[in-house]
Each structure stands twice: as C-alpha cells, then as structure tokens.
Amino acid sequence: MHLTDKQIEDYKNLGVIIIKDVFKDWIEPLRLGFQKVLNDPSKHGRENVTDNKGRFFEDYCNWQRISEFKDCIFNSQAAQIVAEATSSKSSQIFHEHIFIKEAG
C-alpha cells in the first residue's frame, strides 16, 4: 500500500488523513498484546480509578517485551506510511502508548 499524492498533500495541509483497513489484520494480534500488558503491566502501567464507572488503564514502552507490538512495528505498513506522509526516507519509533477505557 502506498499513499496517493492527494493523501500526502492532505497530511501536509491538515496534519491527519484517514486510511481505512490498513491495519485490519493486526487487530487480533494487538488485542492479544494488550491482554498481555493488562496481565503483566510494566513499571509505567497505571489504573486511573475515579468515581466514574469503567476501567481506564494506560501503559507504555512495552514494544520490546510484547512480541505482538514489536511484530506490528517492524512488519506492518506503519513505518512506510509515516515515511511517505512526511516525505521522509525513514521513520523511528519513540515509544508506543496504550490506553484502554472500558464502558461506563
């Protein structure tokens, strides 16, 4: 998958583009990775509990220990899309950050 010239121009002008179905094959593997993080959070993992119903959990910097995250980073089209959208020769991951908000 390559971005169109219009998508690249839209990204430059708007800072955002919608690309449908690019990551659909990654949903289930990433869901498994999220569950692994929930079962074994990193030192950055936080449960943000308030009087509101519904759990809110966040964690980050797990891509090196959660194989599903690392696999997506290195084997999905994410890096290529970012490089094309920004007209860069490469892209670099700083860290991933997950947020899980349950209903309520």
Model-identified regions with their sequence ranges:
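Non-heme Fe(II)-dependent double-stranded beta-helix
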Residues: 1-13, 20-104
